[in-house]
Design a protein with these regions (language model features):
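Non-catalytic terminal extensions that flank enzyme cores
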Residues: 1-78, 212, 228-282, 288-294, ...
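Short secondary-structure transition/capping segments
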Residues: 147-164, 190-200, 288-299, 338-348, ...
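Short amphipathic alpha-helical patches
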Residues: 86, 118, 122, 160-161, ...
Length: 374
């Protein structure tokens, strides 16, 4: 089967849904194989507990670190090119969980890529990164202990040295095979920079963490595959080991398809006015039938419903409550309008509480990061 059929574009991977086929092709293991070992360390965050995290590479190494009280690090990044929405929250919920288990957190602000590939101004990039993302992360519960936040354009010289060294052992043919032929210089720079993001915590200058976990959506797997190959090529010279990774599903957008920052109608942003967010929710696509009569007879389809997914991954904490919502929908006992009203009230309470915390976090966010000079 030609590789082009399975190529994943990290800059535009709309509609990636056939996870099992993709995982089999790229050698990703089901996360359900290892989740029972993670349960030993306490309550799991909703994305893990309710099946949104579906795949992994080498997660056993992270489990070994936890079981032996060894150090490990999390590398995550943010793309400051739009509003932070609930799809992004699904990732940071995982990061906060691992931080509470003792992980050192490295948070890369991808300002180089936002400027070079997404074509935003430097001022926009910096303001979005801090006010829209870092501040929200802090309000959601990310702690400042064991936390390292940096702009890709304003970090330490050892990090930049990695980018230069990596360029020697990566070929254009390899990049084209992974990313396709539409590779402008800005994308090549972004790719090598992300490899440095993922591997630099292993250097002694940054703590020498030999176990680094990168939780991502499947669209970012091309970067992980390339970085694992780079780690192999520098295993003797720099002592690098392959990073571990986990993969989560995309959160379904309110209009169907992927929740995306480029489609405002598809997402619930954490900073939007509460009434505006509730209004979006009330207009959302659902897993309901064509008529109320048909839904009472056949039942709804919560597994296809973005409104149910918001409850599942963000708004309903108790499993028994979620189970009742699911069963009432499937049986036709509850219609979509009733479900939307109840979900809207949960969303309102969540956003009001979150935005109250957020108000005090913007100044704190700016105090944690050294800003680029230009």
């Amino acid at each position: 089967m030609p590789i082009v059929e399975f190529r994943i574009d990290p800059w535009s991977s709309e509609g990636l849904r056939d996870y099992e086929k993709l995982f089999a092709y790229f050698g990703v293991r089901p996360f359900k194989e290892v989740i029972h070992r993670l349960e030993f360390f306490g309550p799991l965050p909703l994305p893990i507990r309710r099946g949104a995290v579906i795949g992994h590479r080498d997660f056993e190494r992270v489990l070994h670190a936890l079981e032996n009280n060894s150090d490990f690090a999390i590398l995550t990044g943010l793309m400051p090119s739009g509003k932070m929405h609930l799809g992004h929250k699904m990732l940071i919920d995982q990061v906060i969980y691992y931080q509470r288990l003792g992980a050192e957190i490295f948070l890369a602000i991808a300002d180089v890529e936002a400027y070079g590939v997404r074509k935003l101004s430097r001022e926009e990039v910096i303001n979005i990164a801090l006010d829209e993302y870092v501040a929200n992360y802090l309000a959601l519960g990310l702690e400042t202990r064991k936390l390292h936040i940096y702009f890709q354009s304003n970090y330490r010289r050892e990090y930049y040295r990695l980018i230069q060294l990596f360029a020697k052992k990566v070929t254009m043919a390899e990049l084209v095979a992974i990313y396709g032929e539409d590779l402008e210089p800005a994308k090549i720079m972004a790719v090598l920079t992300q490899a440095a993001d993922i591997l630099h915590p292993q250097l002694p200058h940054f703590g020498g963490f030999k176990i680094v976990l990168v939780p991502v959506g499947l669209d970012q797997d091309p970067h992980l595959r390339l970085t694992r190959d780079i780690a192999d090529r520098f295993s003797e010279e720099l002592g690098f080991t392959r990073p571990a990774s986990t993969y989560h599903k995309f959160l379904t957008g309110l209009t169907g398809g992927k929740m995306s920052s480029s489609k405002p109608e598809s997402f619930i942003a954490l900073t939007d006015p509460v009434n505006e967010s509730v209004s979006k929710l009330m207009k959302a696509f659902t897993g309901g039938r064509a008529t109320a009569e048909e839904q009472r007879r056949l039942g709804g389809e919560p597994d296809k419903c973005p409104v149910f997914e918001l409850n599942q991954l963000h708004l309903v904490l108790e499993d028994e409550e979620l189970r009742k919502i699911y069963e009432d929908c499937r049986s036709g006992t509850m219609l979509c309008g009733e479900c939307k009203l109840a979900t809207a009230e949960r969303l309102r309470k969540f956003l009001e509480k979150h935005q109250e915390k957020l108000a005090s976090m913007k100044e704190k966010a700016r105090s944690l990061v050294e800003l680029p000079d230009f």
